C-alpha cells in the first residue's frame, strides 16, 4: 500500500509545471497544530508513521522521515523500512533536512511544499539553504498528498465543524471583551493595523469558546483577525451560533463571523487597504503559515509587498500566565483527577492479583470510566499511553485496538501516561508501577534516579525570568551520574482546558525559541524518564505551577534563603498532581534526607487531600489502598 501511495505522489511531482525533485510533507496543519484532524494526517497516510512529530521528504528514489528520539522505536515498528528511511533528528551524524536536500539533489532542482503546512519560520531558512545550493523552493498551490488520495480512491475526510462550546467566566476568570481590549493595547504599541491569530488554542482562549474539531484538544478550526475597531472570526460558514454569540455579547466582545475559507482573500484585501499607509503593519505570529504570511503581505496582489510584524503572538504570552481563577481550577481538577487515577490503580492491582487478564487497551478504557465519574470531565487530554513491560520504553507508545493485545503481567513495570480535559483545567500525569510490587534492583535504581531528578526540579529555587532550559539538567543529573539519559524534554506548558502541550515556555535541553522566561502563574509538566529498549520504561510526571517564593513561603528550600538574586525575585514550583509514587520501587539508599522527607511530605499531602473525599464518597477500599500507598518511607 505504501509503495502505491508513493508512486502516486511521485507521478504528481513529475507532472507539476516545473517537475519537483522533492516534496516535503510536514505533520502540521494550516494552524501549526501539534495534534491534527484526520483530514490533515498527510504524513501518516503517506508513510504509515503515526507519531505526533516528524517531517517526510519524498524524492524520485528516496523516502525519509525526520523525527526526534521519542519516536525512533515507534517509527521502526510502523513504517515499511524497505521504502522509508528514519532520520534520527538531532543526533550528530544525522544531517538536517536542509543539508540532506542540498547534498542529494542536483543543482537547479525544484523542491515543493504546501505553504499552508509550513510556518514562515520553517519556510524562510529552508528557502535560504536551497537558494545557497542553487536550488528552488516553490509553494505548490494544491496539496499533492490530498490529490494522490483522491486519485487512489481514498479522498481525505471532510474537515470537522462541530459546535462551539461557550466557557463561562467562572472558569475563565476574564471576559473575552477584556482580552480583546488588552490585545488592542498591544497592537497600538506596535502600530499594527491588524492582529492575525492563527493558532487554534489562541482563538479559543481569546473568545472564551471551546470546540471538539481535533481529538483531545478542545479547539475549533478558525482564524481570528482583530483590528482597532472590529473583530472577525473565520469559522464554518461564518454564522456564529446563538449561545456563543450571546456569551460574546455579555462579555462585551463584538465579533463578526466570516466563512473559514475566506481568510486568504480577506488578508489580501487588508493588504491592499494598508498598502498606501506606510505607517502601520499587520501583526502575525511567527508560527503562522507561509500561506498566511504571503496573503497578509499581499505578495500576490501588490507590486511591493507589505512589511509584516512577525513575532511571538501576544495571545500566546497572555494565556501562558494563568489568572487566579484558572489556577484554582487547575488545583481543583487535579484533585478530582487524582481520585480517578488512584481508583484505577487500586482496581488494576486487584484484578491482576486475582488472576484476571487485563490488556493495555482494557486498562486505558477503565481509566476513562473512572475519569468520567468526575465533575466537569470533558474527555482525555491525549491518547493514553499504557506501556506494559517493553512497551513502556516506547516514549509515545500507542497500542492498537486491532490484532493481538498486550496483556499486563504481574512482573511488568507498567508506565501509564494519561490526562483529562476538565472545564476548569487540563491534567497530564505519568506514574510507573511494578504490578507485583517487586521490581528488580536495576528497575528500582532507575525508578529512584528518575524520581530524584523530578524532586530536584520540583524543589528548585531560581531567579524570575530564568528560561526553562536552565533547569533541564537538574532532572538529568542523577541519571547522568551513572551514564543514563532520556531522549525528550523535561517539561512543557499546559493549557487551561486547552492543549495539553502549550508554548512558548518549557523545560528542555534545547531552549524553546520564544521562551519568555519563567514567571508566576505558569503551569508546566515535570517529567524526567528512563527507557531501556526492549525491557521497560520509567517516567514520573507531575504538573507544577510557578510561584513566587520568600523566606516565609511553605517551600522545602525557603528556610535556606539569604538573598533574592539581587532583586530579581525568587521563583519555585508547587506540585498540583495528586497521586503517590510506588514506595516499593524506591531504593531508599539512593535518597538523601531531603529527598526522603520531600517524598513523605508529598504523600502526606496527597492522602490528606484525597482521603477525606474518598471517605465522603464511601469509597473505603480506595481510601484504604491510598493510605497504604502514602505510608511513610523509612530507612531500614
Predicted regions and their residues:
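Active-site neighborhoods and metal-handling regions in enzymes and metal-associated proteins
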Residues: 1-636
Amino acid at each position: 500500500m505504501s509503495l502505491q501511495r508513493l508512486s502516486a505522489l511521485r507521478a504528481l511531482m513529475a507532472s507539476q509545471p516545473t517537475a519537483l525533485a522533492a516534496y516535503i510533507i510536514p505533520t502540521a496543519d494550516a494552524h501549526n497544530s501539534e495534534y491534527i484532524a484526520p483530514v490533515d494526517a498527510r504524513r501518516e497516510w503517506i508513510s504509515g508513521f503515526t507519531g505526533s512529530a516528524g517531517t517526510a521528504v519524498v524524492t524520485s528514489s528516496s523516502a525519509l522521515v525526520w523525527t526526534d528520539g521519542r519516536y525512533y522505536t515507534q517509527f521502526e515498528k510502523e513504517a515499511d523500512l524497505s521504502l522509508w528511511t528514519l532520520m534520527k533528528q538531532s543526533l550528530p551524524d544525522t544531517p538536517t533536512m536542509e543539508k540532506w536536500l542540498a547534498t542529494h539533489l542536483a543543482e537547479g532542482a525544484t523542491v515543493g511544499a504546501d505553504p499552508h503546512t509550513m510556518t514562515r519560520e520553517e519556510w524562510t531558512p529552508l528557502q535560504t539553504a536551497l537558494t545557497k545550493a542553487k536550488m528552488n523552493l516553490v509553494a505548490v498551490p494544491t496539496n499533492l498528498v490530498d490529490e494522490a488520495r483522491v486519485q487512489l480512491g481514498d479522498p481525505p475526510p471532510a474537515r470537522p465543524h462541530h459546535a462551539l462550546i461557550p466557557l463561562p467566566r467562572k472558569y475563565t476568570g476574564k471576559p473575552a471583551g477584556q482580552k480583546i481590549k488588552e490585545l488592542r493595547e498591544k497592537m497600538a504599541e506596535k502600530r499594527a493595523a491588524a492582529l492575525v491569530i492563527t493558532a487554534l488554542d489562541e482563538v479559543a482562549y481569546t473568545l472564551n469558546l471551546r470546540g471538539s474539531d481535533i481529538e483531545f484538544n478542545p479547539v475549533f478550526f478558525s482564524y481570528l483577525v482583530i483590528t482597532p475597531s472590529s473583530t472577525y472570526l473565520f469559522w464554518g460558514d461564518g454564522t456564529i451560533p446563538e449561545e456563543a454569540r450571546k456569551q460574546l455579547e455579555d462579555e462585551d466582545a463584538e465579533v463578526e463571523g466570516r466563512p473559514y475559507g475566506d481568510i486568504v482573500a480577506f488578508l489580501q484585501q487588508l493588504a491592499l487597504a494598508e498598502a498606501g499607509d506606510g505607517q502601520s503593519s499587520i501583526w502575525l505570529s511567527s508560527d503562522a503559515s507561509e500561506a498566511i504570511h504571503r496573503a497578509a503581505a499581499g505578495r500576490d496582489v501588490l507590486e511591493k509587498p507589505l512589511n509584516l510584524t512577525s513575532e511571538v503572538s501576544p495571545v500566546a504570552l497572555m494565556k501562558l500566565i494563568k489568572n487566579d481563577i484558572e489556577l484554582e481550577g487547575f488545583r481543583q481538577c487535579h484533585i478530582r483527577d487524582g481520585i480517578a487515577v488512584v481508583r484505577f490503580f487500586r482496581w488494576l492491582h486487584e484484578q491482576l492479583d486475582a488472576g484476571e487478564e487485563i490488556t493495555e487497551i482494557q486498562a486505558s478504557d477503565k481509566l476513562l470510566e473512572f475519569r468520567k465519574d468526575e465533575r466537569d470531565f470533558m474527555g482525555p487530554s491525549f491518547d493514553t499511553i499504557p506501556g506494559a513491560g517493553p512497551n513502556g520504553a516506547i516514549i509515545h507508545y500507542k497500542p492498537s485496538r486491532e490484532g493481538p493485545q498486550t496483556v499486563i503481567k504481574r512482573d511488568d513495570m507498567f508506565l501509564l501516561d494519561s490526562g483529562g480535559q476538565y472545564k476548569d483545567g487540563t491534567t497530564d500525569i505519568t506514574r510507573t508501577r511494578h504490578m507485583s510490587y517487586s521490581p528488580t534492583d536495576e528497575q528500582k535504581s532507575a525508578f529512584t534516579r528518575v524520581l530524584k531528578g523530578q524532586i530536584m526540579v520540583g524543589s528548585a529555587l531560581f531567579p524570575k525570568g530564568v528560561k526553562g532550559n536552565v533547569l533541564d539538567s537538574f532532572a538529568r543529573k542523577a541519571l547522568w551520574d551513572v551514564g543514563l539519559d532520556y531522549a525528550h524534554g523535561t517539561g512543557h506548558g499546559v493549557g487551561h482546558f486547552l492543549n495539553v502541550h502549550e508554548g512558548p515556555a518549557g523545560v528542555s535541553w534545547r531552549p524553546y525559541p520564544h521562551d519568555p522566561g519563567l514567571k508566576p502563574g505558569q503551569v508546566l509538566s515535570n517529567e524526567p524518564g528512563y527507557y531501556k529498549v526492549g525491557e521497560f520504561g520509567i517516567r514520573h510526571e507531575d504538573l507544577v505551577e510557578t510561584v513566587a517564593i520568600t523566606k516565609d513561603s511553605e517551600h522545602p528550600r525557603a528556610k535556606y534563603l539569604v538573598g533574592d538574586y539581587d532583586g530579581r525575585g525568587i521563583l519555585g514550583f508547587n506540585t498540583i498532581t495528586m497521586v503517590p509514587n510506588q514506595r516499593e520501587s524506591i531504593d531508599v539508599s539512593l535518597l538523601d534526607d531531603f529527598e526522603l522527607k520531600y517524598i513523605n511530605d508529598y504523600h502526606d499531602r496527597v492522602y490528606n487531600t484525597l482521603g477525606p473525599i474518598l471517605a465522603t464518597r464511601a469509597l473505603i477500599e480506595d481510601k484504604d489502598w491510598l493510605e497504604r500507598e502514602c505510608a511513610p518511607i523509612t530507612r531500614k
